[in-house]
Design a protein with these regions (language model features):
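Transmembrane alpha-helices and their membrane-interface boundaries in multi-pass membrane transporters
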Residues: 403-417, 440-459, 467-519, 633
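Surface-exposed amphipathic alpha-helical segments in non-transmembrane regions
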Residues: 13, 20, 25, 29, ...
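Membrane-proximal juxtamembrane linkers immediately C-terminal to transmembrane helices
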Residues: 31-47, 82, 130-137, 501, ...
Length: 672
């Protein structure tokens, strides 16, 4: 194989350049995330049944949908939530490896079968089916600090003007509104209803009859009478808009000619569709929020950038006083983490180059293994793209680890060629041919042995297997590419770059005269270390039992400390944000929940001024469910550069918050 490419060096370069181009293209296409997608793909179904209790929603909506979803191909399990605000949510989890698009289509087909069995109100409002990750990528908040807009204004604007735009952003899987649109609220007076002998259904029927969209047709439309001189579309007042118009809706005509109207038995006012949420930003300013879920397999960084670009464009048309904020954003940590790993990768390449130059003492010989590094790394990115993986912490860490391994094959080729040139006096091309005949089998064997160490990780089960499968495949693919480059490109480089040694080997060690003395000193030092090591090994061989006992002791201590080390699924890291989950006793009101959230907010904004940048409180929902007794506080911390000392890290902030929050009575508070 090596002889084939030695006779066709241009072909070898074409292959190497092709591998690099494939890698460059793959880098621009690969999604970027902190970790591989651990959770299996899931499809969420959401619906609203306004006015219904949690039990009613469970019986009339959730159970009907669940019964129709049984038998879905590759579905593992279902989970559902319903609350007293009339919200139903069903999560369908599929087996790992399932195509989310196919799963979404199957769920849609099954849902159509369930629709006729659902309450009419639920059918009219519709059900949303989304394929997205479970965790929020970021939260977009609209706030007003000058008091010109209240929470109802912000919520209506968020849903009517912003939500649809963000849902169309590439990479966004779902936009969950922590808000409600404007709606006409009809407050019934039960005493007046009794006096008039009416029921709430009479009010509903009257509103449906008079608040309708009417198409009035055209004036002078075809076929027209002879001599028609005008054609125009007739416009009439359709949907009612003001409380006065709703109040004037007739409900019943009495025998005496009088009319009972809505205003006679109820009060109409403009409000929000539902009052489940109560949001405040920083020092109690009203807010509305949109939670962004990333589409499965999308690039997290690009998605966040696209969302912010869309908000920047929309902000040009904001009402006076409205501002946008991002109280929760996971992408800065991903960006910093990947940047740190890339920095480590570059440092590792530089260190490998310096170490090779230190030991080889020849810039030409050092360049050859160095050229192999970008070819193999970029080729590995292409392999990741083929497998459908992402650029994440584990794949990048695997590349950092692989750098020290992938240059070994090229170094073996270079050193053997130099040895043959020195001992047998052959020219570079002939020496390379003879060298490759000698070591081709060894190179393949080395690659297989090292790859075999990581093969078992590919077969780990569960979430651990999902995480470390990408790690192992990254290293294995880089090792295989390293062997291929050592057989294809490295011999061509040796034949063209290496030169026979000069008669004065000492003088030919380096072309840089100032470094000659350094390399002479280093070689002498290295030879002394080598001789000392040989003497130590000879001494150890004379006293086998004591050293075997020392070895056994080291192994025992290693096992002892390994068993005492704390374990964890993934390392705890300062991600630049905190989340506090609040749960009050069942039956608690929204007002009580807001009081607790205000105490939490005041602690972080007043006692943690050095670390906290902004804060968003949300009453009415949490990760545990929805309801007046639920709440959350999103805390965004300042940049890591401003929090260098240990007491300013996220773990220390949580440690200080726990005793303070534990003193708040009648609430369970979990800062994470």
């Amino acid at each position: 194989m090596a002889r084939f490419f030695l006779n066709r060096p241009v072909f070898a370069w074409v292959i190497a350049i092709g591998i690099m181009l494939a890698g460059v293209i793959a880098i621009n296409m690969l999604p970027v995330s902190q970790y591989p997608p651990i959770a299996p793909p899931s499809i969420s179904i959401r619906g609203m049944y306004p006015g219904a209790s949690a039990k009613t929603v469970e019986d009339t909506v959730v159970q009907v949908i669940e019964q129709n979803m049984t038998g879905l191909d590759r579905m593992l399990y279902m989970s559902s939530k319903s609350n007293s605000m009339g919200t139903a949510q069903i999560e369908l989890t599929f087996a790992p490896g399932t195509d989310p698009d196919m799963a979404w289509a199957k769920v849609q087909n099954k849902l159509q079968l369930a629709m006729p069995s659902l309450p009419e109100t639920v059918q009219r409002l519709g059900l949303s089916v989304a394929k997205s990750t479970r965790n929020f990528l970021m939260i977009v908040a609209l706030t007003c600090e000058d008091g010109s807009l209240d929470q109802d204004d912000l919520m209506d604007y968020a849903i009517s003007q912003v939500q649809t735009t963000l849902a169309r952003v590439p990479g966004v899987g779902e936009v969950e509104a922590l808000a409600a649109q404007y709606a006409m609220r009809i407050w019934l007076d039960p005493h007046k209803l009794t006096n008039y002998g009416m029921t709430p259904s009479d009010i509903i029927a009257g509103i449906r009859t008079h608040n309708v969209q009417v198409s009035a047709g055209q004036y002078g439309g075809t076929p027209a009478v002879p001599g028609q001189r005008l054609n125009a579309t007739i416009t009439v007042q359709n949907l009612l808009k003001t409380p006065e118009e709703f109040g004037a809706i007739p409900l019943r005509n009495n025998p005496d000619g009088s009319v009972v109207r809505v205003r006679d038995v109820a009060r109409a006012e403009l409000g929000t569709e539902f009052s489940q949420f109560k949001l405040t930003y920083n020092d109690g300013h009203p807010a509305a929020a949109l939670a962004i879920r990333q589409m499965a397999g999308a690039n997290a960084l690009d998605t966040a950038d696209n969302v912010k670009a869309a908000m920047e464009e929309l902000s040009r048309y904001f009402p006076a006083g409205m501002k946008v904020a991002y109280p929760n954003d996971t992408t800065p940590f991903i960006r910093v983490a990947i940047s740190e790993v890339v920095h480590t990768l570059i440092v590792a390449i530089i260190l490998v180059f310096l170490v090779m130059y230190l030991f080889l003492g020849n810039i030409r010989a050092t360049i050859i293994p160095t050229i192999a590094v970008p070819v193999v790394i970029l080729g590995t990115f292409a392999v990741l793209s083929v497998f459908g993986y992402s650029i994440n912490m584990l794949t990048m860490f695997a590349m950092v680890l692989a750098i020290g391994l992938l240059v070994d094959d090229a170094i073996v080729v270079v050193e053997n060629v130099e040895r043959i040139m020195s001992e047998e006096g052959l020219p570079p091309l002939e020496a390379t041919r003879k060298s490759m005949d000698e070591i081709t089998g060894a190179l393949v064997g080395i690659g297989l042995v090292i790859s075999g160490v990581f093969v078992p990780m590919m077969f780990f089960g569960g979430s651990t297997g999902i995480i470390y499968r990408q790690f192992s495949i990254t290293i294995i693919s880089s090792m295989i590419l390293s062997v291929l480059v050592a057989l294809i490109l490295t011999p061509v480089l040796c034949a063209n770059l290496l030169k026979p040694e000069a008669p004065d080997h000492e003088a030919a060690e380096t072309r840089f005269r100032p470094l000659r003395s350094f390399f002479r000193w280093f070689n002498r030092l290295f030879n002394r270390v080598r001789d000392g090591y040989r003497s130590a090994v000879a001494h150890i061989l004379g006293f086998k039992l004591p050293y075997v006992a020392v070895f056994v002791l080291i192994v025992a201590l290693t096992g002892f400390f390994f068993m005492r080390m704390p374990t964890g699924y993934l390392p705890d890291e300062d991600q630049g944000a905190l989340l506090t989950i609040v749960q009050l006793p069942p039956g608690s009101t929204q007002e009580q929940t807001v009081e607790v959230l205000e105490k939490i907010r005041d602690h972080f904004l007043n006692n943690e001024k050095e670390t906290v940048q902004e804060c968003l409180t949300v009453a009415g929902v949490s990760s545990a469910g929805g309801g007046q007794d639920q709440g959350m506080v999103y805390i965004k911390l300042k940049d890591w550069d401003l929090r260098n000392s240990p007491e300013l890290k996220a773990e220390a902030i949580v440690g200080r918050a726990i005793p303070v929050l534990a003193a708040i009575r009648n609430a369970r508070i979990y800062p994470v």
